[in-house]
């Protein structure tokens, strides 16, 4: 996709640029009407050059893009670049690291362990990249060209479920702590330093017992966690006893 990200949309003499030559139009499910504050209250936008160096970082309030309002972007650059954006909901300070320019790795494999006791995976792990969208593009020096890039937000809500085969003995043998090792790329996660070892992520969490459903439930501490806009439910680690 050839896009102009330098110069102005005006022809002839003028005193400045009111708008950038690239407009970003945020959509959800392919239309602007579906993109509201239940999808994102703010946008964190990052631009990287072809070598992975961050060129620009912007915080875009929802008010600036609501109702399908185009967001003008102006930057002097020529060459291949990457546009990465995160949607933010609530008062979260996520400080995500962009996965741009890293090799794609499978987020479908998760390995679970609880001490020396083997557990079995009862549902696949789909990744937890909260509403991430990523586009690559080529920037040109065409100063008169005005383009609109529609960026569709894709939600990736996931759930991690582990079934303990001994049943109710879990409560006495493993009192409330589950260690989970997720193998795969961790560039899109914000992990405490003592929980990070290369591409291996170790999550340690305490569970609360839900008597009505006979489950130990804890919120996934891997950030960012996906959020279902309809229910407000976040990614959870669910252990059935």
Positions of PLM-derived features:
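C-terminal motif of bacterial Sec signal peptides marking the signal peptidase cleavage site
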Residues: 4-7
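Structural beta-strand segments of beta-rich domains
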Residues: 18-24, 158-160
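Structured interaction patches on ligand/partner-binding surfaces of diverse proteins
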Residues: 65, 91-147
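Secondary-structure boundary elements
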Residues: 139-145, 154-158, 165-176
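Tryptophan-paired
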Residues: 41-101, 172-241
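Structural motif
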Residues: 26-39, 163-172
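Conserved "repeat-terminator" motif of extracellular CCP/Sushi domains
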Residues: 150-157, 222, 226-228
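Bacterial signal peptide processing site
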Residues: 9-12
């Amino acid at each position: 996709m050839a896009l102009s990200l330098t110069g102005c949309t005006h022809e002839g003499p003028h005193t400045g640029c009111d708008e950038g030559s690239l407009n970003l139009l945020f959509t959800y499910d392919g239309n602007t009407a579906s993109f509201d504050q239940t999808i994102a209250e703010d946008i964190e936008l990052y631009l990287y050059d072809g070598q992975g160096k961050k060129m620009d970082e912007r915080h875009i309030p929802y008010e600036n893009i609501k109702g399908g309002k185009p967001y003008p972007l102006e930057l002097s650059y020529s060459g291949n670049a990457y546009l990465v954006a995160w949607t933010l909901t609530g008062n979260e300070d996520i400080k995500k690291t962009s996965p741009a320019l890293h090799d794609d790795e499978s987020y479908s494999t998760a390995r679970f362990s609880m001490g020396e006791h083997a557990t079995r995976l009862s549902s696949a792990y789909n990744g937890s990249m909260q509403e991430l969208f990523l586009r690559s593009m080529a920037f040109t020096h065409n100063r008169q060209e005005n383009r609109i890039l529609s960026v569709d937000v894709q939600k990736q809500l996931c759930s991690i479920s582990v079934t303990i085969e001994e049943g109710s003995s879990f409560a006495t043998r493993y009192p409330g702590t589950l260690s989970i090792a997720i193998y795969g790329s961790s560039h899109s996660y914000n992990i405490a330093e003592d929980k990070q070892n290369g591409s291996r992520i170790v999550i340690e969490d305490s569970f609360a017992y839900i008597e009505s459903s006979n489950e130990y439930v804890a919120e996934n501490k891997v950030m960012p966690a996906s959020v279902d806009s309809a229910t407000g439910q976040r990614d959870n680690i669910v252990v059935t006893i």
